[in-house]
Amino acid sequence: MAKPFEKINDINKMKELWKIAVKVHHQWTVISNNKEHIELIFVDANGTDVHVILPTTLKATFDSVLFVNNTYTVTNFLPQINDLMFKTSEHPFVIRFIAGTRVSDINKHEIPGKRLNFKPFSEIISGNWRNDLLVDVIGLVEEIGYKHMSAGSKKQQVNLILKDLV
């Protein structure tokens, strides 16, 4: 008998063998110390999301498999405490792919896209938000402020003035 799917909400450190049906909501590449790894946001059929980390050693294996808006069955991954400085998900854990992680059933699941939870500017200004959690905002770029280079880096900082459209 096939192992049933579990929900992202149920992911914890109490076990190692998981089987989830997910949709890739977002994907990006992180470069650190001249090494690249992939990070993603998975969402399940209940709309629950979780941050996912694919280490450098597995990047080549999954880079040509995982795409935004595709659905997958993902098994055998490592849940770890979400201690990231800036969290993309409220889930207390992140999923880390390991050598035994398997991805299959491409686009065989019916999973809607992640619901965006827009935060009004008034709540942000009043401090009514978690400062370690990234939030969704929608607004109009009213003005582009000054640009400057970060000291000792090639990174550029650009300040934007946003206008709330609510």
Identify the role of each PLM range.
Residues 1-166:
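Single-stranded nucleic acid-binding proteins centered on OB/S1-type folds
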